[in-house]
């Protein structure tokens, strides 16, 4: 079995980790052993927070819709129930955007909802 010198592959592996740790502070960005741990942890945080982001944004949309609905005298739950009864199929992302940027259209939807809630 011939001897294998691992200089090329080891250097490539180290380079990959060090480049992934670019922007980290202290020895985390230039010492391989520490950078490897930092990159691993960063990956764990990224994995976790890709899932958390969905929850956080949904909560933000709900808060915005609630604020918009309360301006027109409805609570969030009554507003969403009215949307279902009026068979208006807009998702929370679109509704929250309308509540912030297109108040006229949101008011029109609220009026339709009020007709179905009462």
From Swiss-Prot:
One of its GO terms (biological process) is ribosomal large subunit assembly. PROSITE patterns: RIBOSOMAL_L20. Pfam families: Ribosomal_L20. One of its GO terms (cellular component) is ribonucleoprotein complex. InterPro entries: Ribosomal_bL20, RIBOSOMAL_L20_CS, Ribosomal_protein_bL20_C. CDD domains: Ribosomal_L20. Transmembrane segments: none annotated. One of its GO terms (molecular function) is structural constituent of ribosome. Keywords: Ribonucleoprotein, Ribosomal protein, RNA-binding, rRNA-binding. The keyword RNA-binding applies. The keyword rRNA-binding applies. Belongs to the bacterial ribosomal protein bL20 family. Binds directly to 23S ribosomal RNA and is necessary for the in vitro assembly process of the 50S ribosomal subunit. It is not involved in the protein synthesizing functions of that subunit. NCBIfam families: rplT_bact. PANTHER family: 39S RIBOSOMAL PROTEIN L20. This is Large ribosomal subunit protein bL20.
């Amino acid at each position: 079995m011939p001897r294998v010198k691992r200089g090329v592959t080891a250097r490539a592996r180290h380079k990959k980790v060090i480049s992934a740790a670019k922007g980290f502070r202290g020895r985390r960005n230039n010492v391989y052993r520490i950078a490897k741990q930092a990159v691993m942890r960063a990956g764990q945080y990224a994995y976790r927070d890709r899932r958390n982001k969905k929850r956080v944004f949904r909560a933000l949309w709900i808060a915005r819709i609630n604020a918009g609905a309360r301006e027109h005298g409805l609570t969030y739950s009554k507003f969403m129930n009215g949307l279902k009864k009026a068979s208006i199929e807009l998702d929370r992302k679109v509704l929250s955007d309308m509540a912030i940027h297109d108040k006229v259209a949101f008011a029109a939807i609220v009026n339709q909802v009020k007709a179905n809630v009462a």
